[in-house]
Swiss-Prot record:
Belongs to the alpha-defensin family. Pfam families: Defensin_1, Defensin_propep. It comes from Pan troglodytes. Residues 1-19 form the signal peptide. PANTHER family: ALPHA-DEFENSIN 1 (PTHR11876), DEFENSIN-7 (PTHR11876:SF33). The human orthologous protein seems not to exist, its coding region does not have a start codon. Has antimicrobial activity. Its main location: secreted. InterPro entries: Alpha-defensin, Alpha-defensin_C, Alpha-defensin_N. GO terms for biological process: antibacterial humoral response; antimicrobial humoral immune response mediated by antimicrobial peptide; cellular response to lipopolysaccharide; defense response to fungus; defense response to Gram-negative bacterium; defense response to Gram-positive bacterium; disruption of plasma membrane integrity in another organism; innate immune response in mucosa. It comes from the Eukaryota. This is Defensin-7.
Amino acid sequence: MRTLTLLSAFLLVALQAWAEPLQARADEMPAQKQPPADDQDVVIYFSGDDSSSLQVPGSTKGLICHCRVLYCLFGEHLGGTSFIHGERYPICCY
């Protein structure tokens, strides 16, 4: 019984020691800066030729595109480029 109590106490101390650095790192992270309300311009460029399906009404039915941070997900294709606050991001469609 003493062994179980000792092991439980050791486990709790180990968990507490492991959790403290995580909390310290979370406290050190700066809050994400929010853009001003009047700075919401988004420029989007689509790749492709002039006869692309983006100009034909109804042909884009069911096409869903997202501006991604780094790269397109599995099953998506690169549909263009977006610029948000001067940063370039891929537009991925499926």
